[in-house]
Amino acid sequence: MMNANRIPIRILGLDPGLRRTGWGVVSVEGSRMSHVAHGVIVPDEKGEFASRLLCLFEGICAVIDAHRPDEAAVEEVFLNTNAQSTLKLGHARAAALIAPARAGLLVAEYSTRLVKKAVVGTGAADKAQIGFMIARLLPTAGKTTADCADALAVAITHANLRIANRRVA
């Protein structure tokens, strides 16, 4: 039982990246989950760093305005061997956290490993396995890119864990 009150809610999942930020929106009513929309925000790779972050922020704000989610969930940063890349990814995550917070949404964060375990059943799942499970869980989503599948997986994880977390609290 995902939504005990049976009041439909929309959840925005975000897979932040400086080159491509995937987003996905799901609707949850009771134990039923359905696909609303998904896409990718792609800043100009040749643009200045600050302009690329602004593009991500404004793109996420536009998604929020268009799809009116009630809550948001963002994938946490994984550590890279390149510290500079990890730092830049952290900036992209900041944009992904601030945009929904600015809109007044509850924002949750989940590790990549937890998202994989929640959707596929193992924290070591690869991109193909995530894509396969997204197609099974949200058949109306159609074919998704890896970024979109990851974002939808984050939204699904939040949908499943939000009720469990409330039961514990």
Swiss-Prot record:
Main enzyme class: hydrolase
Signal sequence extent: none
Record: residues binding Mg(2+) 2: 75
Keywords: Cytoplasm, DNA damage, DNA recombination, DNA repair, DNA-binding, Endonuclease, Hydrolase, Magnesium, Metal-binding, Nuclease
Single GO biological process annotation from the record: DNA repair
Keyword DNA-binding carried by entry: yes
Chain's role: The RuvA-RuvB-RuvC complex processes Holliday junction (HJ) DNA during genetic recombination and DNA repair. Endonuclease that resolves HJ intermediates. Cleaves cruciform DNA by making single-stranded nicks across the HJ at symmetrical positions within the homologous arms, yielding a 5'-phosphate and a 3'-hydroxyl group; requires a central core of homology in the junction. The consensus cleavage sequence is 5'-(A/T)TT(C/G)-3'. Cleavage occurs on the 3'-side of the TT dinucleotide at the point of strand exchange.
Subcellular compartments: Cytoplasm
Name listed for the protein in its UniProt record: Crossover junction endodeoxyribonuclease RuvC
Record-annotated active site: 15, 75, 147
Reaction catalysis annotation: Endonucleolytic cleavage at a junction such as a reciprocal single-stranded crossover between two homologous DNA duplexes (Holliday junction)
Binding site for Mg(2+) 1: 15, 147
NCBIfam families to which the protein is assigned, alphabetical: ruvC (TIGR00228)
Cofactor annotation comment: Binds 2 Mg(2+) ion per subunit.
Top-level taxon of origin: Bacteria
